[in-house]
């Protein structure tokens, strides 16, 4: 699933960097309110946390609520999906980045594969589409 792949990608990237200590991992079921609750508990248990990675923007936005004024200054937050609210949070500096999917490319590739099937050709079982890190440097390109 996308959730497992996002989590595995996070683990793989973290393993490449010494000195990063992951203090907690907890699901929030891709829900903003649960993201708020999880982040609140995390901050109570680990008040010196420096960063929060959420597997979607909804959970990241919940973490931003829990952080209040600390968001983007004392604690960096990264979300995933490139949603409208996630992009706004990046633009105003509360969120460091969101990992944006490319829905136009996903749709185009899906149509290409469906057309192959309609012609009786073999279609790819999986068609990877690159994601894009959206930060303050390029957020204007995605709004």
Kindly label every feature range from the protein language model:
Residues 2, 12-16, 102-143:
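Hinge/cleft segment of the Venus flytrap/periplasmic-binding protein
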Residues 6-7, 60, 87, 107-111:
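A general structural signal for well-ordered alpha-helical segments in protein cores
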Residues 10, 24, 28-88:
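Hydrophobic alpha-helical
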Residues 13-17, 41-45, 66-70, 89, ...:
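Structured segments of extracytoplasmic/periplasmic soluble domains
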Residues 19-22:
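A generic structural motif
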Residues 25, 92-104:
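Short beta-strand elements at the ligand-binding edges of bilobed clamshell
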Residues 81-96, 140-143:
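Flexible loop/hinge segments that line or gate small-molecule binding clefts
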